[in-house]
Amino acid sequence: MDTINHYVGMYPIAAGGVIERAFSPFLISMLGVMVIGFACSQRPLRVGIMGVGFAAIIGWMGMTFFSAGGLKYQNTGYVESLITSMDQEAGSEEAEPEPTGIVARLKAEMAAVEARERGETAAPAAKDRSQSSAKTDYINSLRVTYQKDRERRGTNAVPEWDGSGHQVLLWHYEKSLGRYFNNPVEIRPLVSAMNIASYVVFFGIIAAMLVLLFGALRGKGPFFWLLAAVPALLPVFFIIDYSAWLWWYGHRLNDMGAFSVKPFMPTVFGDGKVAQFSTHSYPYWGFGVMLVLSVVIALMVVLRRKQLNRSAGG
């Protein structure tokens, strides 16, 4: 997909949704705490659950982004996605990096298929490693690639590896932007803006938690109903964010692309066309899960309103 994108001057897929992907574990956990808090009818229990839950998320988020080696607190899928993107870039590196977990598994599977076609019995495959072990391998692979990049570009351009989520986020974003159109004059402002955005989102989440705790303490009013409204509207927020990034891709075209096309808005859902390339964009089952949860939360809102009305009437 990225190969097609760069022909028309679009940035790689890894250049989009950078903040959203990095903060998604904490945001989803936060939404879960909000729903649980909204379901609690007793105020002390509600405030206690939300206070403990939010404090744990803040600690987890802070350790992930700003502590040395904090990347290990991210989920395996996120770290694996970084590795997948770096594997796609391997062809442009001077020295081929060590095979990652994904590449090793693919090579093993291909070898097994070839052995079966020849009528041979493939050697027993090793048992799948645990997610924590795989994540450690992914992080080590990122560290090796980071250090090679530091040796190539110089210690002034690339700081020493500390393994924090914040450092890896910005470095990987810069590498993604420069995969096909390596123009530092264009890339540096984008990386700087993403750095500011990461701090804004980090402290914005903390501020939002304080507001929600205030609403939970009151047990009524608009801040209280946000506990259910925000999770229920998650599919809407997803479509807005997804559409915004599609707009960004279509309006941030690089002049170094092989084809010259006018800025465009890619099709959000359905089939579309960019130059002579066809596009297909359809929701996956995860979007269906969000819709189901929205309906469930809407029913919770109706029941809670009836409960509050009965309490007020009594």
Across the structure, where does each feature detected by a protein language model lie?
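Long, glycine/tryptophan/cysteine-rich extracytoplasmic
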Residues: 1-21, 66-194, 242-284
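Hydrophobic alpha-helical transmembrane segments
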Residues: 20-38, 195-213, 288-296
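Short, low-complexity cationic-aromatic patches
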Residues: 23-25, 47-52, 278-285
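Cytoplasmic juxtamembrane regions at transmembrane-helix boundaries
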Residues: 27-59, 213-230, 297-314
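Hydrophobic alpha-helical membrane-insertion segments
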Residues: 54-68, 226-252
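Membrane-water interface of alpha-helical transmembrane segments
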Residues: 192-198, 218-228, 277-287
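Conserved, well-structured core segments that form or line functional sites
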Residues: 201-208, 222-236
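Long, compositionally biased interface segments
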Residues: 270-314
